[in-house]
Amino acid sequence: MKMLTRLQVLMLALFSKGFLVSLGDHNFMRREIKIEGDLVLGGLFPINEKGTGTEECGRINEDRGIQRLEAMLFAIDEINKDNYLLPGVKLGVHILDTCSRDTYALEQSLEFVRASLTKVDEAEYMCPDGSYAIQENIPLLIAGVIGGSYSSVSIQVANLLRLFQIPQISYASTSAKLSDKSRYDYFARTVPPDFYQAKAMAEILRYFNWTYVSTVASEGDYGETGIEAFEQEARLRNICIATAEKVGRSNIRKSYDSVIRELLQKPNARVVVLFMRSDDSRELIAAASRVNASFTWVASDGWGAQESIVKGSEHVAYGAITLELASHPVRQFDRYFQSLNPYNNHRNPWFRDFWEQKFQCSLQNKRNHRQICDKHLAIDSSNYEQESKIMFVVNAVYAMAHALHKMQRTLCPNTTKLCDAMKILDGKKLYKDYLLKINFTAPFNPNKGADSIVKFDTYGDGMGRYNVFNFQHIGGKYSYLKVGHWAETLYLDVDSIHWSRNSVPTSQCSDPCAPNEMKNMQPGDVCCWICIPCEPYEYLVDEFTCMDCGPGQWPTADLSGCYNLPEDYIRWEDAWAIGPVTIACLGFMCTCIVITVFIKHNNTPLVKASGRELCYILLFGVSLSYCMTFFFIAKPSPVICALRRLGLGTSFAICYSALLTKTNCIARIFDGVKNGAQRPKFISPSSQVFICLGLILVQIVMVSVWLILETPGTRRYTLPEKRETVILKCNVKDSSMLISLTYDVVLVILCTVYAFKTRKCPENFNEAKFIGFTMYTTCIIWLAFLPIFYVTSSDYRVQTTTMCISVSLSGFVVLGCLFAPKVHIVLFQPQKNVVTHRLHLNRFSVSGTATTYSQSSASTYVPTVCNGREVLDSTTSSL
């Protein structure tokens, strides 16, 4: 036992300088409250604020000091009057002042362990007669301690009390460090740890999209661990810290001024997060007021809803968002506290100082130029508001009482008094078996729901619930208004919040990007970015990435995705369609008229002399070429695309095969005349038809093979420079379409060559001249068409219209050059549509529909020249 005592004294000496002197100095004076009882609870409260300079203690802390102290006394009185809670057991108290300093609090707390040391050592002091020595000034044996307030105080005290297994319950310490049961294994609290509060503060910032903020913390466990927890929560929500400042323990004005200057260096960080003790918060707000700095403050419960913090600096604090632990006012305490005055409250040695400070008067003769206090002064609703943590102080006292009650019922089942088993408390058993397992309804709570339950989790922590306040100016006065709450999730009544500039402030490193812009993040910083516009055809995958929708798609209005663009093609009602269709219809009508005239006058000399069979084939090809306009204007489909590919080349092949057959026939006839050869072969009508069909068949075979190798279909085509337009086209390249006309080009060239060769035929064969003119004009049309076709490839409307008009013009050239003169004679010069002469050649003659053989003739003739050879013109012109 002696070894144990010395070990304890040694460990205490490590914690407090001058402890042994204090322990043995009976003249050591301190202010304290001592009320004897069967069981005594210690109490630690910041009755005085921190002193400045060499002073340990400063002014009286009216709210957090005096009110909380009286709350403990009030709770002890109520428990001692309770017939169900610890009946027959009187609770006493031993209350000390911490002066808001951890080192001072530790020195004061040594008084709590004196009884433990004295109790251990008293067996060593015996009188000669064998009786124990009577000791003076015996310290009270402490069953448990209520306090402290600041986390730094509780940490220091907890390190001491654990050595003597004295349970401790704090009513205000929220540092996350205190949840570490390996270090603070006799500590509990009726408030939650700060990481809940840090989470709530981060969610408030995220709610208002404040992503770039500054922070200020008080030096010590409360501020440092609290702001560390906040920074972790902020990172999870992509909130950046512009500057992180810390206020030391010196409490010097210039240090607060320096912090304000640093905050002003970050103009984009309009929101400042405070995790500070109340006195530090007050000094910082005062420093901001001195330079008229305007910030939106988001403060922890160190600020809470205290009027004293903003007094004199209300205009700077206006619009602040503050958090306070969710609590309800204890109305019974209001009545108790308002009944106190210096004349009836003799057990509180600090109450007279509190009274003089509150009413700015003196209870004795005039001091400090103050007047004598009026005896009618009283605490009432006009000068008093219950401090926010009174409920937690009361709950802490009741929690200790409930634990002692359960322990007394277990160890002393046969009496309501303390039995020998509880004369010396087992602090470890009290803490682990009873205190951590308490579960009761909070006293004086008007609400009887789940929120009124007092209990501890496995770490000895209270439940995490917070109220959100807004500092406002209403009705000519400043006050705090509750605007929300947090209990795992955040609720805010945004409409009730007042802002310093009448609108929700912004606090961002960079301005928000426009809906069509992405954020280009700066290296190593998730809150600063450059806004880069997305391309018109891109959508936003997220706020950092623009993604190409791909060909044929376009982003939605909100850029959240893409949709398929409507297919664009020439419609029948478009101006681009009306023109070509009108021309094609006109050409088709003209063709029908020619066919009708030819059929009606099918047996006339002129029609016979024109080669009826080839003319009808030629007219069919012309009709088909006009029909191609309708195929090119129609909406592309596999069938339409097949008809386009088949019809375009085939229509030309029909026309030019007929013309080639005719010019070839004429050329062979007159070559035979020139050379004196036998009658040429295959110049009969049936032979010419078969030759023509053979030439057409070549084209049909080529196109058929092409259709087999490249199956007709459609495709959605988008020009790189016109991504917003999707053109529905046939799945064939423009070059392939023109290549398919290669055979037709060969036919055109051959026709042109033969037409040129037969250009000097006699007048009755001057149809060759008209064929030549037709071919020359056709070549000019197509030579003009090809450049236009390729140049306008970017505009399918112009390209299609050009194609249709060129095809129609080719038909008009054939009608105008070859058939118009014939129709004119048939209809308007019928006198020329008769047989008056016969053509006599040396060895050939042409009559009717063909050239016939003749041995000789005596008819007269008019000499003319065909290919340098004289021939006879003895019939009408064959036009």
Swiss-Prot record:
Endpoints of the signal sequence: 1-22
Ubl conjugation in keyword set: no
Transmembrane region(s): 577-599, 614-634, 646-664, 689-709, 735-756, 770-792, 803-828
Entries under PROSITE patterns matching the protein: G_PROTEIN_RECEP_F3_1, G_PROTEIN_RECEP_F3_2, G_PROTEIN_RECEP_F3_3, G_PROTEIN_RECEP_F3_4
UniProt membrane topology term: Multi-pass membrane protein
Residue positions with a glycan: 209, 292, 414, 439
Gene Ontology biological process terms from the UniProt entry: cellular response to stress; gene expression; postsynaptic modulation of chemical synaptic transmission; regulation of sensory perception of pain; sensory perception of pain; synaptic transmission, glutamatergic
SUPFAM superfamilies, per the entry: Periplasmic binding protein-like I
GO molecular function, one term: group II metabotropic glutamate receptor activity
Spans within the Cytoplasmic topological domain: 600-613, 665-688, 757-769, 829-879
Disulphide bridges: 57-99, 240-527, 361-373, 412-419, 509-528, 513-531, 534-546, 549-562
Chain sites annotated for binding L-glutamate: 151, 172-174, 222, 301, 389
Residues on Extracellular side: 23-576, 635-645, 710-734, 793-802
InterPro entries (UniProt xref): ANF_lig-bd_rcpt, GPCR_3, GPCR_3_9-Cys_dom, GPCR_3_9-Cys_sf, GPCR_3_C, GPCR_3_CS, GPCR_3_mGluR3, GPCR_3_mtglu_rcpt
Subcellular location, principal: membrane
Keyword list, A-Z: Cell membrane, Disulfide bond, G-protein coupled receptor, Glycoprotein, Membrane, Receptor, Signal, Transducer, Transmembrane, Transmembrane helix
A matching Pfam family: ANF_receptor
Cell compartment(s), UniProt: Cell membrane
CDD domains: 7tmC_mGluR3, PBP1_mGluR_groupII
Function noted in UniProt: G-protein coupled receptor for glutamate. Ligand binding causes a conformation change that triggers signaling via guanine nucleotide-binding proteins (G proteins) and modulates the activity of down-stream effectors. Signaling inhibits adenylate cyclase activity.
Similarity annotation: Belongs to the G-protein coupled receptor 3 family.
Protein name: Metabotropic glutamate receptor 3
